[in-house]
């Protein structure tokens, strides 16, 4: 059976950009069991509460990544909320660990996808936003939308 080509997104973490200011991003492989891969290929995963940590041995683990049980799995189905190991180079792990050590910083997954047949997760170091940061972002987005609307109306009125 030939390996699938390209990128197919399984899940996105839209809350991450709302709750965190996103810094550098990395692509990491996932260590998965067979039924987890089958469940992901069916498009079932939730990244909402997921986060990653670097342990004392220098390994990166993903927590709270919800991959539901495979519907046609038998008694050998996987644990839904188990911690999953992320595959990164030693240099990448060291840089990720240095960046995530600061106060208020955490490693958050942005999206989960298949790339050339392998399950990958895009992770980033995020700094938690406070409520006033979120309100300010909403104000900026609304102002930008109003400016675009005014520009579109001006262009529309010129054509008449």
From Swiss-Prot:
A single GO BP: trans-translation
- Kindly give the InterPro entries that the UniProt entry links to this protein: SmpB, SsrA-bd_prot, SsrA-bd_prot_CS
Q: Which NCBIfam families match?
A: PRK05422.1, smpB
Disulfide topology: none
> What residue spans carry the region label Disordered?
139-160
Function field: Required for rescue of stalled ribosomes mediated by trans-translation. Binds to transfer-messenger RNA (tmRNA), required for stable association of tmRNA with ribosomes. tmRNA and SmpB together mimic tRNA shape, replacing the anticodon stem-loop with SmpB. tmRNA is encoded by the ssrA gene; the 2 termini fold to resemble tRNA(Ala) and it encodes a 'tag peptide', a short internal open reading frame. During trans-translation Ala-aminoacylated tmRNA acts like a tRNA, entering the A-site of stalled ribosomes, displacing the stalled mRNA.
Q: What is this protein called?
A: SsrA-binding protein
- Tell me the compartments it is located in: Cytoplasm
Q: Which gene encodes it?
A: smpB
């Amino acid at each position: 059976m030939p390996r699938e080509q390209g990128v197919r997104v399984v899940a996105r973490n839209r809350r991450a950009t709302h709750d965190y200011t996103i810094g550098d991003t990395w692509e990491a492989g996932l260590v998965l069991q067979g039924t987890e891969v089958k469940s992901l290929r069916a498009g079932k995963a939730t990244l909402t509460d997921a986060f990653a940590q670097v342990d004392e041995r220098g390994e990166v683990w993903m927590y709270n990544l919800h991959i539901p049980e495979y519907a046609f799995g038998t008694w050998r189905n996987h644990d839904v909320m188990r911690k999953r190991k992320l595959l990164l180079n030693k240099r990448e792990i060291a840089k990720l660990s240095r960046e995530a050590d600061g106060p208020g910083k955490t490693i958050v997954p942005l999206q989960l996808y298949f790339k050339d047949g392998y399950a990958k997760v895009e992770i980033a170091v995020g700094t938690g936003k406070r409520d006033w940061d979120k309100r300010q972002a909403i104000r900026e987005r609304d102002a930008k939308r109003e400016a675009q609307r005014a520009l579109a109306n001006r262009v529309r009125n010129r054509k008449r």
